[in-house]
A protein has these predicted regions:
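Short, glycine/charge-rich flexible loops or terminal/linker lids adjacent to PRPP-binding catalytic cores
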Residues: 12-52, 64-67
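Short glycine-rich phosphate-binding loop at a beta-alpha junction
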Residues: 1-4
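Internal catalytic or translocation cores that form aromatic/hydrophobic pockets or channels
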Residues: 52-74, 78-80
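Structured catalytic core of nucleotide-sugar glycosyltransferases
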Residues: 7, 42-43, 56
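Glycine-/small-residue-rich active-site loops that bind phosphorylated ligands and cofactors
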Residues: 6-7, 61
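Residue-level detector of flexible, active-site-proximal loop/helix-junction positions
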Residues: 7, 35, 88-90
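Structural beta-sheet core signal
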Residues: 30, 55, 83-85
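PRPP-dependent phosphoribosyltransferase catalytic core
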Residues: 70-127
């Protein structure tokens, strides 16, 4: 399950790698903000087929987005949930443990990280 836009793009790339290297069936889902602190998952998860979930996002700053995503996922009978973050900024305000991190990058609160994932570029900018 990838958070809308970049998290979803990263999740699709991970799904391709998994499908190309392992003989397991995977499904891809997008999680996005519906209202403030309320998220939806599409397509909807099948409660009878929810076993192992990877929750993917591009940048972890405070942890607020991922905590609300986990809250939504826990509405289902999940057996195993792992988190994957491309860039961890180390400014957690919530007790979030990330299972897989691309890069730990200690930044100031005034600095901004922009992840660009499109057909021409796959870049991370710090400003």
């Amino acid at each position: 399950i990838g958070f809308e836009k970049n998290g979803y793009i990263i999740a699709k790339k991970l799904q391709t790698v998994i499908n190309n290297n392992h003989k397991i069936e995977t499904a891809i889902h997008k999680i996005k903000m519906k209202n403030k602190n309320e998220y939806t998952i599409s397509p909807k998860l099948n409660p009878d087929n929810v076993k192992n979930i990877f929750l993917v996002d591009d940048v972890l700053k405070s942890g607020k987005t991922i905590i609300y995503g986990i809250k939504k996922i826990l509405d289902y009978p999940v057996e195993n949930l792992k988190t994957i973050i491309l860039i961890n900024r180390n400014h957690n305000q919530f007790p979030i443990g990330v299972d897989y991190i691309g890069l730990n990058l200690s930044t100031t609160l005034k600095e901004h990280i922009q992840v660009v994932l499109d057909k021409e570029n796959e870049c991370v900018y710090l400003s």
